[in-house]
Amino acid sequence: MPSSPRNRRRRTCVALLSVAACIPARAAVAQERQDSVVELSRSTLRVGDKTIRVLLGRVVTGASVAREASFGSATWNGRRYRGSLDFVTDGDGVAVVNRVDLEEYLRGVLPGEIGSRDPRDRAALQAQAVAARSYAGARMGEHRPAYDVTATVSDQVYGGIAVERPETDAAVRATRGLVLTWGDRIITAPYHSHGGVMTAAPDEVFWRRGNEPWLRPVDDRSPDGGCYCDASLMSVWERRFTTEDLRRLIAQYGRDAGVSLSGDVRNLRVVSRGPSGRVTVLEVETSAGRASMRGNDIRFVLRTDGAILPSTNFALEMSGGVAVVRGMGNGHGVGMSQWGAIGRARAGQDARSILAAYYPGTRLSPLQ
């Protein structure tokens, strides 16, 4: 029998939606200069011990706030959510938090995270359901005061009822209650779009954190010599930055990455790479000196049209005042590659095999 995880006191997920003043059945929400309306259904939701709290948004307001509970669904800013809304005050204002059954929450997560897929990708969808449930379950075990997860890429993208799809709903049902565990602990199961030839160890990317035994570089090459991720349109990419682009980007975003240099950019240099080949340290030389940025911070500095760099798995060439960055993959690279999972599903692997490949040493356990 699979072991049962210990962090199982509650299974209700809370999502932050926004700040609001509450009125029976309707609540007006002020967001910047725009008025929004929260409409609450009058049906009753039985909130059990598998409810997660999802943060959907935040509005700073001086309005008085009341907590709403025991509603079947709610609409905020034109988007419907299952469960109920909590209006929570904290130091940042008032937060609208969606309290929803964990399995219902996943129905609003999978479409935004892995998209609508055809039947041959069924095993990948099931693997995604387990990974997303594990991620949420681990967050729920942290006992945050107001909410468990946000509804954005900071945690997992959650779109509510409008995004639900039959194929992703089926994946949630097929894996109901299953999470990944290490010993008696639910693991935080990160995932990303496309890992390239090899996924990353956490300290290659999230260098401020330590490694975990179930997260290590995984070779994603298939037996035919290709890569399981090859169906992705982001297998390879190229970005170009002039020295003026670099000066502007470093001035705007560099401080958060530990680069506070001013002046003209003279050079970018890869100092080190991790086991997966990703750039772990990138040196910037300007007329004012040198400084380095590390791991995933690099992606948030080297932006084009506001979009961060697809990954840190790249080669760099400086020529004629232009930095040419050629890379592969999309996302941080840690944990399960979603396109790799799709490729493995199309090659005949089931969800259990896919999860074992990307989270080695873990077990599938029932959430109780």
Where are these regions (language model features)?
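Conserved, single-site charged/polar hotspot
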Residues: 2-368
